[in-house]
Amino acid sequence: MAGELKGARVAILAADGVERVELEQPRQALDQAGASTELLSLHDGQIQARNNDLDDAGTFDVDGLVRSASVADYDALLLPGGTVNPDKLRVDQSAVGFVRDFVESGKPVASICHGPWTLLEAGVVSGRTLTSFPSIRTDLRNAGATVVDEEVATDGNLVTSRSPDDLPAFCRAIVETFARTGAGAGGAR
């Protein structure tokens, strides 16, 4: 895995309530593969992480604001889950627009657990094959997605996964997909 993403800039979009392991483990996999990761959020400072949505799990430092971010500055996007995190993102027009523009750019986008709620809000799931946490699958189907119950679903530039239990497979898939789709070339700047 080391070096596959050398020079790549990966945006991680998350808000308060992010599931800690769903941000931490994919970020570690991307960093180990040579990517540079930047945490974008709705406010500066730090975001509050959770374990299983209920327990305080510390904080993450925010690197930039999504309202000031440009898709052109990044090679790939990661959308971690947690229930509260995507619920906050999906009502913020700058976050929704950033996700929509990212998917439409053809650059790779990865999302896990409840993270696909933000993809749904961005209007980019119709006709796509995705997986997610079971409780949002009806929402995805109602938005026109084909939903599968698999560790990882890859459809073009979208990579989705179900839950923290699937993190090893998800981390492998995002590194492989980001590298295969050109994120490893580090073209953003």
Task: Kindly label every feature range from the protein language model.
Residues 1-105, 109, 118-124, 129, ...:
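Extended, subdomain-level signal for the structured scaffold at the beginning of enzyme domains
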Residues 113:
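Catalytic, metal-anchored helix/loop core of enzyme active sites in primary metabolism
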